[in-house]
Amino acid sequence: MAASRSTRVTRSTVGLNGLDESFCGRTLRNRSIAHPEEISSNSQVRSRSPKKRPEPVPIQKGNNNGRTTDLKQQSTRESWVSPRKRGLSSSEKDNIERQAIENCERRQTEPVSPVLKRIKRCLRSEAPNSSEEDSPIKSDKESVEQRSTVVDNDADFQGTKRACRCLILDDCEKREIKKVNVSEEGPLNSAVVEEITGYLAVNGVDDSDSAVINCDDCQPDGNTKQNSIGSYVLQEKSVAENGDTDTQTSMFLDSRKEDSYIDHKVPCTDSQVQVKLEDHKIVTACLPVEHVNQLTTEPATGPFSETQSSLRDSEEEVDVVGDSSASKEQCKENTNNELDTSLESMPASGEPEPSPVLDCVSAQMMSLSEPQEHRYTLRTSPRRAAPTRGSPTKNSSPYRENGQFEENNLSPNETNATVSDNVSQSPTNPGEISQNEKGICCDSQNNGSEGVSKPPSEARLNIGHLPSAKESASQHITEEEDDDPDVYYFESDHVALKHNKDYQRLLQTIAVLEAQRSQAVQDLESLGRHQREALKNPIGFVEKLQKKADIGLPYPQRVVQLPEIVWDQYTHSLGNFEREFKNRKRHTRRVKLVFDKVGLPARPKSPLDPKKDGESLSYSMLPLSDGPEGSSSRPQMIRGRLCDDTKPETFNQLWTVEEQKKLEQLLIKYPPEEVESRRWQKIADELGNRTAKQVASRVQKYFIKLTKAGIPVPGRTPNLYIYSKKSSTSRRQHPLNKHLFKPSTFMTSHEPPVYMDEDDDRSCFHSHMNTAVEDASDDESIPIMYRNLPEYKELLQFKKLKKQKLQQMQAESGFVQHVGFKCDNCGIEPIQGVRWHCQDCPPEMSLDFCDSCSDCLHETDIHKEDHQLEPIYRSETFLDRDYCVSQGTSYNYLDPNYFPANR
């Protein structure tokens, strides 16, 4: 037992053995450092950790009467934390070994089943190269080894062994790699649970902390160093002293259920939980696939001493000196071979296989080797390894769904190296990891490095993409920028046009229409090309049509509809802002409040704007002519007025000629009544599409028109005095505006008489002259058949020119005097001969010139030199308008037929 063995150097032991990181990266995969066999175990330990100060802590073999001494021992060990590794003396190790052997001999009298013996022989045959097989072992220790290798199982269970490799962290940053050979299934005694509970109690973990421990297969905690040979009596003492006797096995079996209720996305700053999390990461990363998922499904029953001795007997690769006894030297070399065999036997699909419950116990035992006050410095290792693909220990980066770790395809040594890389990437700030974030890593590590123990589909469900706050803020800003509407205007446009919504929408529509026109031209060219190809091969073209193949024909476009613009706000004499205060009481207080509320309008507000106050305007929403959303996207406008659901279908719509004729017939059919509203209701019911209010308004306007035209009114004659006051700025007064309006439908059945224009006597004169010219040209001596010849037209031109010459000669002779007209340039009065009258000046301020001053450049404030002058050859007679009988249709008090409606 005192013989040495070869020790495998792993990534977890590099810093402890004095090796640098570069050596770890180059040679650590498949390299082993063998120590001389003649060196004793004590010297081997001291040579591997020469800086450790030996501080012997005697561990007494306790019984039920020595609880106080052991607890003092535990408290003393908690009060001091060594930043360096230390070694144990040989006396300590002898005492520990002796105590372990005595504990194992107590249960030596129990019979050993033949199945266990056969398993033991198989284990020995698997490791023929072991350096310790040649040394004889006493018969009593052989029985102890047989009992300590396996858990007490029934003979019916299959005996295939699974190797579980656990990485242990103690209070001095020590790392141990244990090898536990157990059967597939095995019951565990409740004494084991009591022992683990006792360790938890000694370390200050009571029932309230049981919810924090979320992993069955790895319960990270501890400050005691008796992780492999602690006595059962000591555990009873610990349980009794800390009041944890009520802790049952269900705390561990139900911890998987507790872990399912933990939010894996919320961080916290519990340093204690952080260290537990890191220990759990390291342990579970070292587990093979088939050992991870079965830990919560096995019953926990079995003899305690066998479990403890199996932990002691199957240790492998002890890297640091702790409270481990001399049983470290009893570790077999075949455990290395079994580790490789178990890793190679991992299923390629990553599906979980049953694993013994003893893994949970070993993880519990090894997690109790770390003091609480040392947890803040435990994760500050200076070693950094390159992050592996899908590393679950890197908490600073968000999890990604596509990060499945391909551990199944790696060799055993590569797997171990990868796990060591993951171990070295622990966060240095203990406040970065929350209790709920511990649940993330616990759950993900239970899955065995992202999907080792669970199927990949289940493992992916626990890992989601969590964007950082900056990413979410940038995404939100980008969405807000995308919501901003596109503004269409030219830099050279006027400021009023740049901020005008109708102008911007119009430019946007023009831009879209131009693009659609370009696309239409390209589509026409494509259609012509396809037509020529189809004419070359018509049969193939028809076959493609029958097969419904994609020929590449262009798709039809949805032509953008022209925007509806309310022109009243631009053509009316008053703007929106002035119209708002027209015909209202102009109180200063009210005007000030309105200004404070709405402010000065930066641009004219269109009634077409469907947005409310405070909402952003959208200029990019263009209605499509053939789309159903074109008309329903905003409120309907009918001749400049908003139409809502409360308005009738014919709201603000012009009356058609048919409706007007039917109205005239109904006015005769329904005579006037005392209550006119009844009459209007009857007519509205007869029409069917108009309301009584619309009929009353129409009839009122119709009666006024009839009265002004002098036509008998089929009802009460309205008082025209109320309606005779017209605005001088009416748009209908301008003669050019008569083409902008549709003819009235009021007088559809009445043909008004034709009157001569009384305001212009010259039109009568010119019309008479034109008639005379036409009479003169119609010479009956010339046959009708010759009147279409060009010679006849030339003859008419000569006759017209002759008449003009005669008029000019008469004017130059001085016989014509324009009485009442004075030349505005030379001042001669009356003007003789031809009088030149300005046509561009207003009639009240028009200028007249004589024939000699017609070529002068006379200008005034009103008259300019570019004005057009009209020659007048004949003098006009004076006509006093005050003595003329009015030919209008308005009332006249001199008219004997004057009979007003209201007397």
UniProtKB/Swiss-Prot annotation:
Residues 91-109, 135-145, 606-615 have a biased composition (Basic and acidic residues). Zn(2+) 2 binds at residues 838, 841, 863, 867. Zn(2+) 1 binds at residues 823, 826, 850, 853. Residues 1-15, 61-79, 297-311, 324-344, 390-450 have a biased composition (Polar residues). It comes from the Eukaryota. One of its GO terms (molecular function) is zinc ion binding. InterPro entries: Homeodomain-like_sf (IPR009057), Myb_dom (IPR017930), SANT/Myb (IPR001005), Znf_ZZ (IPR000433), Znf_ZZ_sf (IPR043145), ZZZ3 (IPR037830), ZZZ3_ZZ (IPR041981). The modification Phosphoserine is found at residues 82, 89, 113, 130-131, 135, 606. The keyword Phosphoprotein applies. GO terms for biological process: chromatin organization; regulation of cell cycle; regulation of cell division; regulation of DNA-templated transcription; regulation of embryonic development; regulation of transcription by RNA polymerase II. Changing residue 848 to A: Loss of histone H3 binding. Residues 680-703 bind DNA. The keyword Metal-binding applies. A zinc finger (ZZ-type) spans 818-877. One of its GO terms (cellular component) is nucleolus. There is a cross-link at residues 276, 647, 708 (Glycyl lysine isopeptide (Lys-Gly) (interchain with G-Cter in SUMO2)). Component of the ADA2A-containing complex (ATAC), composed of KAT14, KAT2A, TADA2L, TADA3L, ZZ3, MBIP, WDR5, YEATS2, CCDC101 and DR1. Interacts via (ZZ-type zinc finger) with histone H3 in a methylation-independent manner and acetylation on 'Lys-4' (H3K4ac) moderately enhances the interaction. This is ZZ-type zinc finger-containing protein 3. It comes from Homo sapiens. The gene is ZZZ3.
